[in-house]
Structures are given as C-alpha cells and as structure tokens.
C-alpha cells in the first residue's frame, strides 16, 4: 500500500507540474492505442493484448510528461499441473517521453502502480490468492510522427513472491509491439 501511495503522489506531482507550466508553445494530446505481446517469463500466462489511453503535455518540443492508464489482458495457461487463470492489469502511472526529432525515433516509459484484476485465485485448482497489484513499468522505443506512434515495449507488474506456487513463479509481464494515435487538444 505504501508503494501505491507513492506512485499516486508521483503521478500527481508530475501532472501538477505539467499543467502549471503550460505556455503557448506546449502541445497537449490524448494518446489512444493498442498492443499485443508474449508473456515473459511465461510460467502462468501465455500472451497479452491491451489498450492504452494517456494524456501527454509536451513540456519542450522534445520532452513530454503526462498520465497513462489502460487495460492489458493476460491469458492464463496450464503449467506444472496448475490451470492458471487469466489476469488483467489496470495501470495508473506517469508517462515520460523523449523525442530527439520532430519525426522519427523516440523512447520513454510509463511508471506507476498496476492493479491486477480478474479471478481471486492464481489458478482454478489452487487456493492461493492472486496479488492485488504492484510497481508498474512500461518502457518503449519506437517511431513517431505528428499523428502516430509505433513501438516495441516491455510491460511488467512487480509483485514479488506473491502468487508463487511450488514449481511456478507468478508473473505479469510481456514483450510486445503496439501503436497509438495522437488526438490533439491544442496548444
């Protein structure tokens, strides 16, 4: 719970700073996108599909801050005799992006807290409770222009050893690819 409060405080500070520092040269946008990925490591899940929504404020032409959320669905799989349940991630975090040029290569990350949603148990044939969430990170690198972003990403919710079963680590993470469309909100 302490990490959750820190993540919310961090996101609030970044958002307040971005909103209070606006000038005529800043661009505001909503980013709406989708992604797909393969679970890594894949003890309890096989693949993931997700949607992303974010608000971004360009503090300078090459540096953006904002807030990000969305939903990623991880498909459970059978492993070591466990019939693992699907799990969803609802992240709440800060968005940080670096754009070296107006069009071309970019990189950045989302940092915050990932809420895990879905079945209460790790597996249908287990009594172990699913973790509620943990520290969330989503670094990405890709290509951008004024309207679109195309990227590869790593997405992970750190839950420690919560949800681990004998011979199986509980993991919520993937390596994938995605895109987002930028909806301009003005300067």
Mark where each language-model region is.
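Membrane-embedded beta-strand positions of outer-membrane beta-barrel proteins
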Residues: 30-36, 67-69, 94-96, 107-111, ...
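Outer-membrane beta-barrel translocator domains and adjoining extracellular loop/strand segments
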Residues: 42-49, 77-85, 117-131, 160-169
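Short glycine/proline- and aromatic-enriched beta-strand/turn motifs that initiate or cap beta-hairpins
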Residues: 21-59, 65, 174-176, 180-187
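Glycine- and aromatic-enriched membrane insertion/assembly motifs of diderm outer-membrane
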Residues: 41-101
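Transmembrane beta-strands of outer-membrane beta-barrel pores
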Residues: 36-40, 57, 69-75, 100-102, ...
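Predominantly the C-terminal beta-signal and adjacent terminal strand-loop region
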Residues: 74-77, 135-187
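Cleavable N-terminal export/targeting peptides
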Residues: 1-27, 185-187
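Residues that define the transmembrane beta-barrel architecture of outer-membrane proteins
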Residues: 28-30, 45-49, 86-92, 131-137, ...
